[in-house]
């Protein structure tokens, strides 16, 4: 028998529509639904990626994350350079709006332009329906910032996210709701599967080769087949196929991973030869060392990821374990170089590289180095950190940062890989 005291959960996930582009339109006194505007770094040339396109351009078929040259030539549009710190400030103002209505314990910030909110305990307090409460917050966001929001609602976090991603954009008020029954009625046979959260294009193609085209197919597929495709995530996917997600915001916030890693990735300004990419990768390893020292931790291993200019070439990855955990710059730089030159197959020009410090442990839990040179280098790196914190990241540079292929100086002016606008 169902416990009458158990209140059914109601979650909302609010998305700020074409956030960066909308902010740039508002700041120019333009209507995002009428102005053709993209946020992109024009200095990267016609191949520069558009971080956001205005709703007006989206309505004309221009896709988000396209490259500048992919926009039809007959469309005249504004190119707004990215200002990441400015967008962060805008997002903080919007977060303050949420806090007027709900506690921070009931908010999970998923990204700069998207957050989950547990509305369950507030509906009775405000004497409002779930849609009414969501609309109240969305209206205040629009009134205060000029940014339009859309909202997905559901009886669990997954259903709220799917309602947002697939249904909300088709609703006049920008709000859509799903429970398990509605999910199966409206979306169980929806195609393509890549429209669903956590299923990418490559996974969709694998599923289609196995005769699986929709969530209903996943729900009825042999578990052994799904385990081969999804690995340890198979049972999460099966739950999602049935509209089930037991995880709560409180559980997400309380979660602490058993191991920690530090990762950074960089899209190169042009296609790089392998010998050129090594320079950027060593810069990234050096910055990673500074980051580890600043956090007083060491890495037990290192991984690099490489994406090639030829999109048909699959991404390559290579890893290395250290005999003892380290945060020494020269060790990380040497390891990164060895992985790229000796472990990554040379199949063509490189467009994107990533580096990750794996299984990070506290510095005081590891053995001290017996080598005086390591101790000296760490002392130098700590001094470098202090100088950079006080005078800026470009106040002191390595010789490698001055090479023509290097990207470190430019990256130091960015937030999340994009220009801060400062």
Where do the model's predicted regions map?
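DNA-contacting surface of Y-family translesion DNA polymerases
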Residues: 13, 205-347
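Acidic, metal-coordinating catalytic segment for phosphate/diphosphate chemistry
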Residues: 23, 318, 322-422
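Short Gly/Ser/Thr- and Asp/Glu-enriched loop/turn motifs at secondary-structure junctions
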Residues: 110-114, 154-157, 297-301, 348-352
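Catalytic palm subdomain of template-directed nucleic-acid polymerases
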Residues: 117-138, 211
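Long, highly charged, low-complexity intrinsically disordered interaction regions
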Residues: 131-192, 354
């Amino acid at each position: 028998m169902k416990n009458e005291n158990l209140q059914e959960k109601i979650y909302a996930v609010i998305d700020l529509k074409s956030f960066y582009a909308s902010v740039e339109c508002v700041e120019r006194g333009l209507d995002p639904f009428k102005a053709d505007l993209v946020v992109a770094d024009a200095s990267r040339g016609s191949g520069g990626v558009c971080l956001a396109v205005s709703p007006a351009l989206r309505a004309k078929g221009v896709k988000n994350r396209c490259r500048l040259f992919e926009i039809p030539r007959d469309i005249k549009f504004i190119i707004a350079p990215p200002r990441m710190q400015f967008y962060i400030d805008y997002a903080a103002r919007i977060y303050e709006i949420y806090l007027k209505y709900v506690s921070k314990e009931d908010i999970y910030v998923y990204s700069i332009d998207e957050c989950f909110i547990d509305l369950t305990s507030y509906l009775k307090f405000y004497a409002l329906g779930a849609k009414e409460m969501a609309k109240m917050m969305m209206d205040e966001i629009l009134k205060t910032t000029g940014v339009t929001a859309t909202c997905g609602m559901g009886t669990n976090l997954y259903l709220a996210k799917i309602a947002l991603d697939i249904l909300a954009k088709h609703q006049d008020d920008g709000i859509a709701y799903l429970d398990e029954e509605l999910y199966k009625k409206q979306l169980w046979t929806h195609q393509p599967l890549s429209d669903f959260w956590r299923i990418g294009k490559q996974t969709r193609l694998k599923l289609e080769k196995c005769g699986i085209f929709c969530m209903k197919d996943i729900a009825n597929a042999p578990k052994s087949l799904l385990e081969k495709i999804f690995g340890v995530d198979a049972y999460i996917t099966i739950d999602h196929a049935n509209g089930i997600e037991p995880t709560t915001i409180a559980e997400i916030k309380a979660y602490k991973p058993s191991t920690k890693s530090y990762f950074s990735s960089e899209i190169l300004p042009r296609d790089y030869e392998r010998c050129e990419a090594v320079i950027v990768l060593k810069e990234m390893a050096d910055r990673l060392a500074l980051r580890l020292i600043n956090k007083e931790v060491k890495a037990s291993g290192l991984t690099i990821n490489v994406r090639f200019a030829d999109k048909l070439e699959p991404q390559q990855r290579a890893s290395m374990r250290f005999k003892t955990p380290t945060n020494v710059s020269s060790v990380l730089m040497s390891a990164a170089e060895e992985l790229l030159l000796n472990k990554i197959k040379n199949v063509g020009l490189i467009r994107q590289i990533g580096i990750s410090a794996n299984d990070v442990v506290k510095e005081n839990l590891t053995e001290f180095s017996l080598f005086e040179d390591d101790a000296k280098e760490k002392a130098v790196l700590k001094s470098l950190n202090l100088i950079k914190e006080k005078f800026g990241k470009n106040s002191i540079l390595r010789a490698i940062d001055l090479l023509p292929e290097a990207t470190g100086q430019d990256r130091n002016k960015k937030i999340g890989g994009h220009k801060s606008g400062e």
